[in-house]
Amino acid sequence: MSTHRKARGMRTQLLVAQYLAANGWPHAESTGSGRSGVDVLGTPGLAFEVKARTDLNPLAWVKQAEQNAGLPVAVFRPNGMGEHPETFIAFLRLGDLTALLRAAGYGTEPEEQG
């Protein structure tokens, strides 16, 4: 990996951690490079995997996040996105998304299958 790509990845991880810290997870912090596990610490119940790449492989990223405890979320910063983490793209499984949306008051409880 080139020095520029590695620096962009670390910068993206830091931006995501700072965004989370300012938006409800005050203890969020970037793990730094070379550490195994989640990319952002201080987000109990969540497992963030942060990617700043040109290739697109969300299934692998979500599976990587699933290796850690918590709700797996892969955050992707495509090229040309700038340094605005609120515009980055987040991937999570549809079942997890619908559960979160229902908990937030959207939709209705699923019908029981008999």
What are these regions (language model features)?
Residues 1-114:
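Catalytic phosphate/metal-binding cores of nucleic-acid and nucleotide-processing enzymes, i.e., regions
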